[in-house]
């Protein structure tokens, strides 16, 4: 999607990707090999004017090595923090960004100390390699913690208090090389088995106070890293306050709605930021519902029978829980967007949350 956004700007792309025949190879040149292959990294640097990443499992060491030869954005330091939940939590604390109570777990003695600091119910999360709900275990009673840690392979982890949040939001901001910052509207996210299924943009019922909190914490993070590119911050709303859950230093699934519902998509703005070009408009052009396609591809004709639907398929091999594409339903009328979303959900056998009003997810 980055390459598709860059093509009209005259940009050409080379991808480093281990899987042969990846869908990205349709829109650029693919180097097939491991993300830490020194020879391929050297070739990528030689072939590129600048390098970015859209996958958090890229080794930070590879990004740092590339940065010695050509500009890399977002900064490798942000990638390192985004890959480690403990570093992430410590960073939130250092910037006085509210977050859930947590404790480090790295030894048997830490298990006892963690239960003194974090009330149950809590969630044990591996420090690294957690994505779409992986690397987590729910702890309902204190006696379950050791078993949960064994379940995670005794990997370094954090124990985090379960937050009784009202909803999950995402704040997406982009910062250019010259320091220019632009922010998209806050969006509301809904998950299915730990995987993002639905994003509503803008988030229904936003208040100036919520928008101000999101802008302040995003600005603190962007400044902390001297950031370049798109940064997503996943947030919990709790009684009018925002708690930071995690950062994603890359273009983000909850920003895919911008392809059809914003004046400039997150993908184009990410590229503009890295190139030092002026940023595009980030305001929404109406109301958008983004529905992820999981596990099985739909009939394109059925999806596109909805007048405001935009179908984006990724040409990936279907498997359970895999994101195969997404549909954006975008328009100026929140009732029409809601009606078409409900029709799409019925066609795909997707369970949707109940709308705030009988006929609309947004106030009318």
Spans of features found by a protein language model:
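Active-site nucleotide/adenylate-binding loops and adjacent lid/helix of ATP-dependent enzymes
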Residues: 81-170, 174-221, 331, 345
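Anion (oxyanion) recognition and catalysis
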Residues: 7, 45, 66-67, 93, ...
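Peripheral (often C-terminal) accessory segments that flank ATP-dependent C-N-forming ligase machineries
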Residues: 271-364
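Active-site "cap" helix and flanking loop/linker of ATP-utilizing ligase/carboxylase catalytic domains
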Residues: 212-233, 238-239, 248-296
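Short, low-complexity Ser/Thr-rich regulatory SLiMs
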Residues: 173-177, 235-239, 315
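ATP-binding N-terminal substructure of ATP-dependent carboxylate-amine bond-forming enzymes
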Residues: 1-87, 109
């Amino acid at each position: 999607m980055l390459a598709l956004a860059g093509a009209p700007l005259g940009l050409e792309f080379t991808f480093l990707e281990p899987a042969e025949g990846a869908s990205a190879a349709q829109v650029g040149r693919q180097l097939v090999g491991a993300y830490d292959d020194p020879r391929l990294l050297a070739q990528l640097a030689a072939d590129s004017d600048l390098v970015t990443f859209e996958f958090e499992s890229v080794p930070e060491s590879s990004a740092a090595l590339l940065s010695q030869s050509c500009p890399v954005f977002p900064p490798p330091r942000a990638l390192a923090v985004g890959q480690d939940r403990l570093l992430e939590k410590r960073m939130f604390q250092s910037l006085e960004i509210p977050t859930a109570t947590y404790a480090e777990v790295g030894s048997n003695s830490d298990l006892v100390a963690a239960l003194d600091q974090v009330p149950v119910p809590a969630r044990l999360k591996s420090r690294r390699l957690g994505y779409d709900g992986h690397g987590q275990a729910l702890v309902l009673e204190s006696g379950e913690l050791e078993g949960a840690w064994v379940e995670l392979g005794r990997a370094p982890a954090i124990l985090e208090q379960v937050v009784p949040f009202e909803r999950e939001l995402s704040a997406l901001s982009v910062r250019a090389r010259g320091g220019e910052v632009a922010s998209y509207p806050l969006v509301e996210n809904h998950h299915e088995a730990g995987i993002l299924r639905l994003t509503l943009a803008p988030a229904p019922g936003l208040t100036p106070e919520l928008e101000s909190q999101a802008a302040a914490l995003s600005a603190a993070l962007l400044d902390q890293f001297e950031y370049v590119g798109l940064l997503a911050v996943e947030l919990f709303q709790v009684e009018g306050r925002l708690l930071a859950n995690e950062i994603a230093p890359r273009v983000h699934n909850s920003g895919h709605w911008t392809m059809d519902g914003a004046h400039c998509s997150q993908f184009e703005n990410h590229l503009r930021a890295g190139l030092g070009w002026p940023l595009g408009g980030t305001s929404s052009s109406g109301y958008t519902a983004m529905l992820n396609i999981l596990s099985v591809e739909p009939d394109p004709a059925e999806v596109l029978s909805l007048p405001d639907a935009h179908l984006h398929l990724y040409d990936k091999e279907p498997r359970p829980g895999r994101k195969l594409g997404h549909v954006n339903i975008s328009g100026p009328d929140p009732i029409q967007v809601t009606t078409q979303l409900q029709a799409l959900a019925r066609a795909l056998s997707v369970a949707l949350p109940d709308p705030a009003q009988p006929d609309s997810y947004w106030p009318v």
